[in-house]
Amino acid sequence: IENFRPGVLERAGLAPEVMHEWNPDLVIVRISGYGQTGPWSHKRAYDPVTQAATGYVAIQNNPDVPIPDLVRNALVDKATSHSAAQAITAGLLARERGELGQTIELSLIDSGLAFFWPDGMMKNTMVGEGVREGPALYDRYQLTETSDGHIVMWAGGDNEWHAVFRCLDRPELCDDERFATGAARVQNGEALANILHQEFKK
């Protein structure tokens, strides 16, 4: 496993093809910031910078403080390490099944984007006529303010939402056509948010 910037191994006479001449069964993983080739390949890569480049920063907007922000842990670094572990496992399996060694190229930008894409790009993936629209997952990732601090409140299906309404002593909301079903709650999200905000602050 190496994570030098592109070209360092080659200049040291340790290019993958050279090492495979010495040992054809080697599984070599090359981790870079932005790939072995391309306009950014020479740049240094740091987790916060790749968070910004892959979209994490853009969706960290807190409605109360509407500015972009970082995820405050080394998210992309860790996503890349998991991707590397999976890639190594695949390379070892290929070797076990009779293939020669492998050279696997992995970058922070690729791993970060792959980890971000499913929910981070939810609003831009299924679009057009006939597509059921709803809030992106990250729109719902918000703290709930109460009278003495903040909590994390999450409800999924109708039964959970109806339990929330009853806990707030608002059982009539269970039968309110605006909030009784998931589709209705999506259509009336702003009205529901206003009610919840008022009730949780009591």
What is the meaning of each model-derived region?
Residues 2-10:
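Rossmann-like NAD(P)-binding element
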